[in-house]
Amino acid sequence: DLTTLQADTLVAWDAYLGSASYSPDGKQLLVTGSPSAFGGIGKNCGEHPIANDFDTQAFIMDLATKKVQAITRDFNPTVSLVQWNRVDGCIYFDTTDGDCRHIYRYVPKTGGFEMLPLEEDVITSFTLANDNPVVAAYVGGGNTSTGVAYTYDTKKKVSTLLANPMKPILDKIELGQMEEWNFTASDGTEIKGMICLPPSFDPSKKYPLIVYYYGGTTPTTRGITSPYCAQLFASRDYVVYVIQPSGAIGYGQEFSARHVNAWGERTADEIIDGTKKFCAAHPFVNDKRIGCLGASYGGFMTMYLQTKTDMFAAAASHAGISNVTSYWGEGYWGYSYNSVAAADSYPWNNPDLFTKHGALFNADKINTPLLLLHGTVDTNVPIGESIQLYNALKILGKPVEFITVDGENHFVLDYAKRELWHNSIMAWFARWLQDSPAWWNDLYPERHW
């Protein structure tokens, strides 16, 4: 109270809260937090005992009564606040909505959500005018665009293009056709995905396939700016399958809760099942020439997948996790990430989760040629995660290569190093999937010690 300078405690202690902001009239508080916030009134994760705390929910607290309403409990997208507009009284949310990022408007009077019909699939910035609820500005992109700016009339629901600075460049680039491809898992769950075809696609030909996934708690967002962008690989004459397996936010709490205390178990099965069904549905794919790729948790998935199947002809893992225990204990983020991904589990009370789910403890099952890449100063996933699996596979006489990126952290940011890193991945797949070892041999001539 700015008049009396007295403080009033609204919430005594709740470790699951994220952010809070006042309503325009100052009578309510909009709070974001995990489904477990406020005693779990926002939980809606089915039979799973623990919700995924990365699946951010929204709550409204009445400051007079201290009563809290979980407004997103039955709303599948994951939310973060944009603005509680003081003119129209609506709350605008930036959401992770499957593999898209949409803007939704929540109407407190009706309790309903409405997705704004904006022009792009992935909205990276959205701002409402302070004094005019009709005017907004936003920037977005998708599978064929990036950094496109618009104004938006919230009354007419019409966007007006302001700027598209990348268009002159993208107009010179032939992109492959992309479309959704989903399948039904053995338990009846629909698993979403995308297919990307080579720009010069010929349905009468047979193409090698690259399967990309993250597999962790966030989906693979649509776009063309990621270093793992499907279009990059399609441009090298691969068909690309991007899969969104169980555990990701943006598909509802039951789906995201599958990530907790799983460490790849269900996810690996879905990737294998989805890849088999993808090949069966697309006769132009050579099912003997399948590669797989992932980074960070996706790198963990790449390593772990090879202990489950020999269906891949080549695999690449950047900054992957080979031992859940050492990742939990050594990295800057491992213990905090596991507080959600392995909630209430530790090496001493759930040793199977921390050992049997790591590729290191199953290294003898790996037969797929595996490329490991890692920054030497990675503070998220320490480089030892790749070193120890490389050592194990070399001892076992398995086909493995290990590339270290000097001075780089979890992401390779130095341009020259990034270029070599990218080319190394491409050369690795060309070697094993396209019978073209020359590029790899040129980059890394065979050594005779």
Which residues does each predicted region cover?
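Residue-level recognition of a conserved intra-blade site in WD40 beta-propeller repeats
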Residues: 22, 84-86, 128
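Short beta-strand element of the alpha/beta-hydrolase
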Residues: 197, 204-215
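Non-catalytic accessory segments flanking enzyme active sites
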Residues: 19, 94, 101, 113-202, ...
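Short loop/turn segments that connect beta-strands within beta-propeller blades
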Residues: 2-5, 62-66, 107-111, 153-157
